[in-house]
């Protein structure tokens, strides 16, 4: 195969080294504090445990 048919893709040096740039938006729609997130998750886990005790599987 002639070398003229082979196309070399130009890859940025940073991506060749395994470095990736992530662009994060600063305008988040919902902001939840980490403490509130932990409290909500504990309440949900407790709710699932209580529901599994009160409602026996068929």
From Swiss-Prot:
- Stored Pfam families: Sec61_beta
- Function as written in the Swiss-Prot or TrEMBL entry: Involved in protein export. The function of the beta subunit is unknown, but it may be involved in stabilization of the trimeric complex.
What InterPro entries has UniProt attached to this entry? Preprot_translocase_SecG, SecG/Sec61-beta/Sbh
Protein name as it appears in the record = Preprotein translocase subunit SecG
Q: Which residues form the signal peptide?
A: none
Q: What is the lineage of its organism?
A: Archaea, Thermoproteota, Thermoprotei, Sulfolobales, Sulfolobaceae
Q: Give the encoding gene's name.
A: secG
Q: List the disulfide bonds.
A: none
Q: What GO cellular component entries does it have?
A: plasma membrane
- NCBIfam families referenced in this protein's UniProt entry, alphabetically: PRK01253.1
């Amino acid at each position: 195969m002639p070398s003229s048919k082979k196309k070399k893709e130009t890859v940025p040096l940073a991506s060749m080294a395994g470095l990736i740039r992530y662009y994060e938006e600063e305008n988040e729609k919902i902001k939840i504090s980490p403490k509130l997130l932990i409290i909500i998750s504990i309440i949900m886990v407790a709710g699932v445990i209580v529901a599994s005790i009160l409602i026996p599987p068929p």
